[in-house]
Amino acid sequence: VRSSAASDVYKRQTYTFPLFYEEWELEKSNITTAWDNKGDIVIGNDVWIGYEAVIMAGVHIGDGAIIAARAVVTKDVPPYTIVGGTPAKEIRKRFDAEVIQQLLMLKWWDWSTDEIRQCLPYIMEGKINELLTRNKERL
């Protein structure tokens, strides 16, 4: 271990106590106000998140989105969009705009178990046109 002249880790505490610089008088009941809360992470339905992906606070992941492995997501991801990288950027849409709109209206994830079971082959095999045709009355 090397220590620079500005930081002698052998003689003093190395923790910087950031909470106490500006909020020393803060009551324990208000401790979360010391940090900038960017909001909850909201993950839609039918989303796939790759291994070790990081999603930052306040980000919304749209229905049907795919997050690549080890992506760092700092901004909202639109529905049925594939993103990857650091920071995550759009790679492409999973479907054309019309199909995306129909899938968002279809909301198959809200169906009963029996309804999903009947359409499972279409969903699992990626037969989106057949799924939409079979369920036109829902659109």
Predicted features by range, described:
Residues 14-55, 87-139:
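C-terminal segments of enzyme domains that contribute to small-molecule binding surfaces
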Residues 5-6, 39, 69, 99:
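Activation loop
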Residues 1-6, 10:
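Single conserved hydrophobic/aromatic residue that forms the stacking wall/gate
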Residues 39, 44-45, 50-51, 56-57, ...:
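Left-handed beta-helix
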